[in-house]
Each structure stands twice: as structure tokens, then as C-alpha cells.
Curated annotation (Swiss-Prot):
It catalyses: Release of signal peptides from bacterial membrane prolipoproteins. Hydrolyzes -Xaa-Yaa-Zaa-|-(S,diacylglyceryl)Cys-, in which Xaa is hydrophobic (preferably Leu), and Yaa (Ala or Ser) and Zaa (Gly or Ala) have small, neutral side chains. One of its GO terms (cellular component) is plasma membrane. GO terms for molecular function: aspartic-type endopeptidase activity. Its main location: membrane. It is found in: Cell inner membrane. The active site is at D116, D132. This protein specifically catalyzes the removal of signal peptides from prolipoproteins. Pathway: Protein modification; lipoprotein biosynthesis (signal peptide cleavage). It comes from Nostoc sp. (strain PCC 7120 / SAG 25.82 / UTEX 2576). This is Lipoprotein signal peptidase. It is an enzyme of class 3 (hydrolase). PANTHER family: LIPOPROTEIN SIGNAL PEPTIDASE. Pfam families: Peptidase_A8 (PF01252).
Length: 158
């Protein structure tokens, strides 16, 4: 039996694994609030927790985010299993989004928050994690996929 949408599953697994591994490393290595300058004033590892969405949007105790992560994950798994064979960019994009959604979703269900640690200070950006990065990269992949597809014609012949 041939495995349908193989790149989707590989991307999802790698994204999920990298996200969980990096969060585990941060929790084991740093105290909450501790920061390590990698490039001082530009990029730091800073251990914070986030009860909001990606990039600290909707900060606060937001219960619906755990269910959103679960719903997105289930929809993407259903698409990969039951839907058509996707092109490579779609598989990569949806797989990265699934890996990120599962990584943050598991944190929300198990901990009630997400571990964030990527701190770009040069642009004064919110602290985020690898799952957020994978979701963002996945969206870019889907945009690239949509640009490569020919526009569908909605004109009826006369």
C-alpha cells in the first residue's frame, strides 16, 4: 500500500518533534523569565509562557484556543487521509501547519499555556516558539502553491 501525501506526514512529524524538543530543552535549561543573549540586543532565548495565541495575540486565559488547535489538527488529518493527493507545496504547507497546531495544542491541553522562547529584540517582536514559526512557514507554502496553480475559469461557453 502506498502512503498518500507522504510529504505532509513527514513535515507534520518533523515540525511537531522539533517544536516539542526545543520546548523541552528550554524548560529544562532556563528558569521562567530567564534570557540568554545569542546576538545581544538582536536575538535572545527568553523563556516565557503564553496563554494567548501565536505571537502573544489574545493574551490571557483563552480556553477556545485549545479547541481551535484540536479542530485544525483533525481537519488537516482528515484532508490528508480522505482528500485528494496534494501537490508538494500544499503537502508541505498543511503538514507544517499540522505539526505546529499539534505542538501548541498539546501544550495548551497539558499545561494550560504554551512555552515561548524565540525573542527577536531588534524589531521588538513578541516572543514565540517553533510551532508558531512552522505555522507561519506553512502559510507561506500554501500561498506559493496558490500562485503556481492556474486560475480556474468560471466562464461558461456560449
Amino acid at each position: 500500500m502506498r502512503f498518500k501525501n507522504r510529504l505532509f506526514w513527514i513535515a507534520a512529524f518533523i515540525a511537531f518533534f522539533v517544536d516539542q524538543l526545543t520546548k523541552y530543552w528550554v524548560v529544562q535549561t532556563f528558569s521562567l523569565g530567564e534570557t540568554l543573549p545569542i546576538l545581544p540586543g538582536i536575538f535572545h532565548f527568553t523563556y516565557v509562557t503564553n496563554t494567548g495565541a501565536a505571537f502573544s495575540l489574545f493574551s490571557g486565559k483563552v480556553e477556545w484556543l485549545r479547541w481551535l488547535s484540536l479542530g485544525v489538527s483533525l481537519l488537516l488529518i482528515g484532508l490528508a487521509l480522505l482528500g485528494p493527493v496534494l501537490d508538494r507545496w500544499d503537502q508541505l504547507g498543511y503538514g507544517l501547519i499540522l505539526g505546529g497546531a499539534m505542538g501548541n495544542g498539546i501544550d495548551r491541553f497539558a499545561l494550560g499555556y504554551v512555552v515561548d522562547f524565540l525573542d527577536f529584540r531588534l524589531i521588538n517582536f513578541a516572543v514565540f516558539n517553533m510551532a508558531d514559526s512552522f505555522i507561519s512557514i506553512g502559510i507561506v507554502c500554501l500561498l506559493l502553491a496558490s500562485l503556481q496553480k492556474p486560475p480556474s475559469s468560471h466562464h461558461r461557453p456560449r
